[in-house]
A protein has these predicted regions:
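Long, histidine/aromatic-enriched segments associated with O2/redox biology
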Residues: 3-8, 32, 37-56, 63-451
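N-terminal secretory signal peptides
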Residues: 1-33
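Compositionally biased low-complexity segments, especially N-terminal hydrophobic helices
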Residues: 14-16, 58-61
Length: 451
């Protein structure tokens, strides 16, 4: 919930849902191509090969922005000016993992990024990792793909890669020849009031965000990238997420979080190109940061909700803490879900209808110098703790142009004055990563950093 722009703005005209781009043969239910089916098409010539190319590549304009798939197509293009998985319509499932780089050799790190790029190109198209996949390699060697997604399609998988501060330096010493290349905006996040961070759930040199509509597809992707990185990286932390807590397109409905409220009503959308340029895409403040063109900064926060306490809170108090009705998501000042909150409207006794310490007021752009962010978080649950309380909450993910202006001030204010954040939430994990622009065909993730 923290950092969530609950304060809604009136929506522009609802964009029509994208039309179907692929109709026809499918060896899987629902009219979608399986991984084996894609290989079959790839092996054909002439018109069939052209169909496969159109299915996998889309047109050049669409690919340049790494957009969502057309209609029911399970493939999201990997290449583009921006990485997929940022403005892509949010999928249903998440598996995100941070890695520590264990190799000390620059050439091995570069080769890993090339190998990851090659694997990501295959996985996001619904193909196995490696030349021989899960079953076509030699019996005396481990398979190049783990195989649990053999019978599944791409599932709208996106893989988004980022670099943490630890990639650039460790204990004050530059790593991998990257002295002076750490972006100024890639700061060490400050300690916020109420933080109870677990170091084992925080930080990391590299991060990979895998989002898909099928959880097995997302897990398969992270598992295979970790396998490819064996000996060069090790997993520092990972998190599974379900039930997106924001929409990134006007074609999507507003989801609910584990408090039962609609979440992310005023989130930035892919249709808001001007606002994305202003609030999401990074701007290089110096020549050394030119490799971040088309990129962004990923803020990750694991936020545990005090579920049992919340469940004993009255409906009226819950709505006052949020500043919205639980049913429709309308602001307490009146209207519908997308009605702009009226923070000056008063009720009986002259009290504001939207409380001064409510989440919607504290997170609203008018209270934060007009700052917006693109949220892409997910609900999570990790069983229960030792006293029988659910370990559940929000895995908060936001993409911003600069965390110094677009995350830290808002989070600091909310950690001090948002009663919801103070009494019902606990931050247990944290990370900040520089997400470079999209990889071009023939290139690799973050290649500009190593040029």
């Amino acid at each position: 919930m923290t950092g969530c722009p609950f304060g809604a703005r009136p929506p522009e005209a609802q964009a029509e849902a994208p039309t179907d781009a692929l109709k026809g043969e499918s060896p899987t239910p629902g009219g979608r191509l399986s991984r084996r089916g894609l290989f079959g098409i790839a092996g054909l010539g002439g018109a069939a090969a052209g169909l496969a190319a159109g299915f996998l590549g889309h047109d050049a304009v669409a690919a340049s922005a790494a957009p969502a798939p057309d209609g029911d197509s399970p493939v999201v293009p990997f290449h583009g000016d921006h990485q997929a998985g940022i403005t892509t319509p949010a999928q249903d499932r998440l598996h995100i993992a941070a890695f520590d780089v264990t190799t000390t050799k620059r050439e091995e790190l570069i080769q890993l990024l090339k190998d990851w790029t090659q694997a990501a190109e295959a996985l996001t198209e619904g193909r196995p990792a490696g030349a021989t996949g899960a079953v076509d390699g030699p019996y005396g060697a481990p398979p190049e793909d783990t195989g649990e997604a053999l019978d599944l399609n791409a599932g709208k998988l996106t893989l988004t890669f980022g670099f943490g501060a630890g990639l650039f330096e460790q204990d004050g010493v530059a790593r991998f020849g990257l002295d002076g290349r750490r972006p100024e905006a890639l700061i060490d996040l400050p300690h916020f009031p109420g933080d109870d961070l677990d170091p084992a759930r925080s930080g990391g040199d590299l991060v990979v965000q895998a989002c898909a509509d099928d959880p097995q597809v997302a897990v398969h992707a992270i598992r295979n990238l970790a396998r490819i990185g064996f000996g060069k990286v090790r997993v520092r932390w990972s998190q599974l997420g379900f039930g997106r807590t924001s929409s990134t397109s006007r074609a999507q409905h507003t989801p609910r979080n584990l408090f039962g409220f609609k979440d992310g009503t005023a989130n930035l959308k892919v249709e808001d190109e001007r606002l994305l340029d202003q609030h999401v895409w990074a701007r290089a403040s110096r020549p050394e940061d030119a490799w971040m063109a088309g990129g962004s900064y990923l803020v990750a926060r694991r936020i545990r909700m005090h579920i049992e306490t919340w469940d004993r809170t009255s409906l009226g108090e819950q709505e006052g803490l949020i500043g919205r009705t639980k049913g429709t998501g309308a602001p307490l000042s009146g209207g519908e879900e997308f009605t702009e909150p009226d923070f000056n409207r008063q009720g009986k006794g002259g009290k504001p209808l939207i409380p001064l310490d409510s989440h919607v007021r504290m997170a609203h752009p008018t209270q934060n110098n007009g700052v917006r962010m693109l949220r892409r978080g997910y609900n999570y649950t990790d069983g229960s703790d030792g006293v029988g309380h659910l370990d559940a909450g929000l895995f908060f993910i936001a993409f911003v142009t600069d965390p110094r202006t677009h995350y830290v001030p808002m989070q600091m204010a909310m950690a001090k004055g948002d009663t919801l954040a103070v009494e019902y939430l606990k931050h247990t994990g944290s990370g900040l990563f520089a997400v470079p622009g999209g990889a071009k065909p023939g290139g690799f993730i973050g290649d500009g950093l190593f040029a």
